[in-house]
């Protein structure tokens, strides 16, 4: 479980640092195949330190779980602290409107047609949707860890 978390943290970090353009949409524009990344690549490159911090926090959190071997109070504290820092950094990073590639939305319209108001709105707000999912997952992770740490510390 902890090893999978470490692997995921490393993969996330590498993908966003090395090839963030992999998350893209493909469409045909004027007879030419075009690939538009979801995120603004320049912003991603400028904020590489956020991505590195997310990776370090994830590896640190999972490493403590791996070293301790069970849900201890130390694991609980490390999880809460790293998730709070992770959440704060994620809010700062994802709420910047520069993160989204404006050309991506043109690709959505090209792909689905101009009458795709709902789809366009979802993608225009994607950074906020993505943020909500991440904050929700961090919250669930904290709650699960606290419950398990308290449960196993009584035994």
Set out the residue ranges of the language-model regions.
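Hydrophobic alpha-helical bundles in membrane proteins
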Residues: 1-155
């Amino acid at each position: 479980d902890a090893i999978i978390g470490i692997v995921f943290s490393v993969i996330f970090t590498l993908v966003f640092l090395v090839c963030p353009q992999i998350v893209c949409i493909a469409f045909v524009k004027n007879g030419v195949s075009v690939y538009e990344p979801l995120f603004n690549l320049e912003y991603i490159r400028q904020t590489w330190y956020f991505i590195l911090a997310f990776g370090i926090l994830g590896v640190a959190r999972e490493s403590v779980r791996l070293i301790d071997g069970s849900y201890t109070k130390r694991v609980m504290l490390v999880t809460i602290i790293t998730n709070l820092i992770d959440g704060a950094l994620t809010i700062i990073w994802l709420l910047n409107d520069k993160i989204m590639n404006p050309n991506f939305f043109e690709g959505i319209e090209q792909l689905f047609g101009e009458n795709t108001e709902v789809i366009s709105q979802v993608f225009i707000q994607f950074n906020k949707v993505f943020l909500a999912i991440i904050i929700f997952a961090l919250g669930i992770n904290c709650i699960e860890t606290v419950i398990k740490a308290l449960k196993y510390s009584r035994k």
